[in-house]
Regions:
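Divalent metal-coordination and catalytic microenvironments
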Residues: 3, 46, 171, 230, ...
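Metal-associated gating/positioning segment near the N- to mid-region
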Residues: 1-58, 63
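Polyanionic/metal-chelating signatures
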Residues: 39-183, 188
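Histidine/acidic-residue-rich catalytic or RNA/ligand-binding cores of hydrolases
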Residues: 10-14, 66-69, 194-201, 216-225, ...
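Active-site-proximal loop/turn and secondary-structure-junction residues that shape catalytic pockets
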Residues: 6, 60, 163-165, 188-190, ...
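Short, basic, glycine/proline-bearing loop/turn elements
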Residues: 20-32, 175-180, 207-214
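Glycine-enriched alpha-helix->loop->beta-strand junction motifs that scaffold or abut catalytic
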Residues: 175-182, 198-206, 233-236
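Short acidic/histidine-rich active-site segments
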Residues: 58, 206-211, 230-243
């Protein structure tokens, strides 16, 4: 399962929420590893449905959310790899969370700006580290959030982005500008951009979940057919549970 939150969202109350840190729109320093309860009964449900491995990621309240990992549904040694991606989000999730607080990002403009600013900051941080060389006195102050972005800039992991049809071209533009790999997660409306998404900066499209209700605007098109359209164009495609 290429997009899941099982083990980190035990119920629908704040006390059961351990993968969605709705306090700052930029939380790249976080790691889903520390929010997972390996004894969560949802792992048993996953096994029953044939899901042996999940990409467990922080929730999508923030523009940059934190690292995600690959994790087995059962067994003694369950962590496969951490990180596998840096989770990010565009559209209604960060807009909805922070508009209620009367703070940025309330618009898609602000989301794009914050995402680009973070990536610029990571590149600047990397340049300062490189310029310092072996001189520890010239190194910039250690910043875990910026450190978590270095594998993205180096194309070792993708930026894994919650994105619907109103955000896909913006995300592709950002991926090209910073020469990074991205996955487009949820991706409702991708059939409108099938040709454009067949781009080397798009590591993959993770569609779904297929059972969610339609909602106005960006979530108003549940186009299952995009999976075949993208596959025909050589795009890596998966279907998520969003568990």
């Amino acid at each position: 399962d290429a997009h899941s939150h099982i083990g980190g969202i035990a119920d629908l109350t704040p006390l059961g929420e351990d993968l969605n840190e709705i306090t700052n729109p930029l939380t790249p320093e976080l790691d889903a590893y520390y929010g997972i309860n390996p004894k969560d009964k949802c792992f048993g449900y996953a096994i029953e449905q044939g899901i042996t491995t999940s990409c467990l990621i922080p929730g999508s309240a923030n523009v940059v959310c934190g690292w995600g990992m690959a994790y087995k549904s059962a067994g003694e040694h369950r962590l496969i790899k951490d990180p596998v991606a840096l989770k990010a989000a565009m559209g209604i999730n960060p807009k909805g969370c922070y508009a209620a607080k009367k703070m940025a990002p309330m618009t898609r403009m602000a989301i794009a700006n914050l995402m680009k600013k973070y990536l610029r900051d990571v590149k600047d941080y990397m340049a300062k580290k490189a310029a310092a060389g072996d001189d520890a006195t010239k190194l910039p102050p250690y910043d875990l959030g910026l450190e978590h972005g270095i594998p993205v800039i180096e194309k070792k992991i993708p930026l894994k982005v919650h994105s619907y049809m109103h955000d896909m071209m913006t995300l592709l533009e950002i991926a090209k500008e910073f020469d990074i790999l991205v996955t487009m997660d949820h991706a409702q409306g991708a059939s409108d951009f099938a040709d454009e998404l067949a781009d080397p900066h798009v590591k993959g499209v993770v569609f779904g979940p297929t059972c969610e209700p339609l909602f106005p605007g960006e979530g108003g098109k549940l186009d299952y057919e995009c999976c075949k359209m993208l596959d025909d164009r050589g795009v890596n495609v998966a279907v998520m549970t969003d568990g």
